[in-house]
């Protein structure tokens, strides 16, 4: 597993405002989108490209375009949806799938899958899993293996904040045959007894969309 933690003053500034409990949902959503675009620049560094002959107004040349099959972006519902706009603005030609998973509150590293909208065959596809928080790591491992069951061998996870416990769990449980990378804005101190990241930013889904009782 490859882990990349962004080190940039803009990321630090935006992340500080994002964490602030007084930041309203409207600003929170904008900041998530902006942070994801900064992360995506790093996460997409190794996208497959092919030669593309074109003509400029001055002369013919050979440039590069994204190769087929197109990469696929997979937000983990519901909080991952808040990251989708930033990803599609950077990669408008990418396909988008959806995966609904939630943590079993009695068994934090176990996941319940309640929805999916994905191609049956992901062979040869570069997959980008997006979810704001990497807490216990259970959701990320389960989601990655879900993609791998459909043939995915190249998976990049984009998370805003991670906990050390989650990173360790992912390192220990991810299938080593998968080319796997994690890009985060920050690795925080720890998980608390409720498996929330500390200092974290609270419940990302609630802060993006409001609390659902």
Swiss-Prot record:
Q: EC number(s) of the enzyme? A: 2.4.2.9
Entry-linked PANTHER family: ADENINE PHOSPHORIBOSYLTRANSFERASE (PTHR32315), URACIL PHOSPHORIBOSYLTRANSFERASE, CHLOROPLASTIC (PTHR32315:SF4)
Residues annotated as binding uracil are 197, 202-204
Under which name does UniProt file this protein? Uracil phosphoribosyltransferase
- Report the family membership: Belongs to the UPRTase family.
| Species, as recorded | Bifidobacterium longum subsp. infantis (strain ATCC 15697 / DSM 20088 / JCM 1222 / NCTC 11817 / S12)
Q: How is the cofactor bound?
A: Binds 1 Mg(2+) ion per subunit. The magnesium is bound as Mg-PRPP.
**Top-tier EC class:** transferase
Q: Which reaction does it catalyse?
A: UMP + diphosphate = 5-phospho-alpha-D-ribose 1-diphosphate + uracil
A GO biological process this protein is involved in?
uracil salvage
TM annotation in the entry: none
Q: Which residues form a coiled coil?
A: none
């Amino acid at each position: 597993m490859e882990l990349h933690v962004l080190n940039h003053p803009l990321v630090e500034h935006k992340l500080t405002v994002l964490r602030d409990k007084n930041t309203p949902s409207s600003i929170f959503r904008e900041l998530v989108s902006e942070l994801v675009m900064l992360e995506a620049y790093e996460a997409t560094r190794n996208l497959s490209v092919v030669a593309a002959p074109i003509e400029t107004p001055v002369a013919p040349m050979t440039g590069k375009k994204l190769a087929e099959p197109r990469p696929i972006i997979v937000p983990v519902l519901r909080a991952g949806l808040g990251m989708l706009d930033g990803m599609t603005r950077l990669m408008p030609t990418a396909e988008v799938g959806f995966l609904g998973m939630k943590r079993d509150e009695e068994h934090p590293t176990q996941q319940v899958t309640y929805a999916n909208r994905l191609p049956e065959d992901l062979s040869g596809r570069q997959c980008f899993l997006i979810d704001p928080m990497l807490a216990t790591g259970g959701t990320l491992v389960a989601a990655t293996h879900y993609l791998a069951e459909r043939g995915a061998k190249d998976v990049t996870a984009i998370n805003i904040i991670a906990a050390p416990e989650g990173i360790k769990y992912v390192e220990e449980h991810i299938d080593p045959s998968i080319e796997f990378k994690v890009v985060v804005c920050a690795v925080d101190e720890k998980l608390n007894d409720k498996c929330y990241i500390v200092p974290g930013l609270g419940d990302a889904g609630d802060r993006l969309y409001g609390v659902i009782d």
